[in-house]
Amino acid sequence: MIYEVLKKHKHVMEYDEEADIIKKSDIVDLLKKTWEITPSKNNLMPWQVFVIGPDNQNYKNIVYNICSKNEDIANSVNEYKDNDYIKGRNPAYANIKSCQYLLIMTQRLSGPLNAYQQKQWDNGVFYDSYTEEGLADSENTICIECGIFGANFSALAIEKEIDTSYTLCFTGKIKYWKELPFINRPVTLLMTIGHGKKYRKNIIFNDPKPNFERIVKLI
């Protein structure tokens, strides 16, 4: 049952760096299956997924620094900020440094169009993400689709006893990602992959989500 699978998800604070490396072929298989089952508005998929593997620790370190610096800036406006906090160091992002694989999802200008889409375009149908201006206006759609892709990948990974975690604590603006030469569009979502060592559920004992009635309103 998919419900039982999804219940097993746990946010990883830190991955086991001594665990056996997950085969690249297994990750590719999961990614292909995720791509296959993930829907997209008009089948345009105006986003892309960059896969950082075990051999590119330098890229993971760069992403860790981007997230930590963003945290420094975000928390600085809180009047109750932690005075003992060490700038540039955040254990919440240890999963980025210690993961085996890191997924970086970004926007993508749609195209080339398939035969059906081209016919529709020629008949006057406008695809937002097929133009630069329209792509900028498609941010919400792109974020939703990346979230669906991430959730699908996570579910498939759980079936293989592989852990995943999401990170959204960063600025997606390209100027902050210049150290990664392959990033040329705004970043939308980060996902880490590996075998967990420390999990948030085991560290934080009293952090419940808002109750069902607060979130779901039956009209």
Protein language model regions, located:
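N-terminal amphipathic, basic helical "cap/leader" segment at the start of enzyme domains
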Residues: 1-108, 112, 217-219
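C-terminal helix-cap and adjacent tail motif
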Residues: 2-14, 186-219
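Small-aliphatic-rich amphipathic alpha-helix that forms the alpha element of a beta-alpha
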Residues: 30-35, 103, 109, 119-178
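Short, hinge-like loop/turn segments at secondary-structure boundaries
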Residues: 67-68, 182-184
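Generic beta-strand structural signal
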Residues: 99-101, 160, 187-189
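Short, acidic Gly/Pro/Ser/Thr-rich loop/turn segments
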Residues: 110-113, 198-200
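A short secondary-structure junction signal
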Residues: 114-118, 169, 202
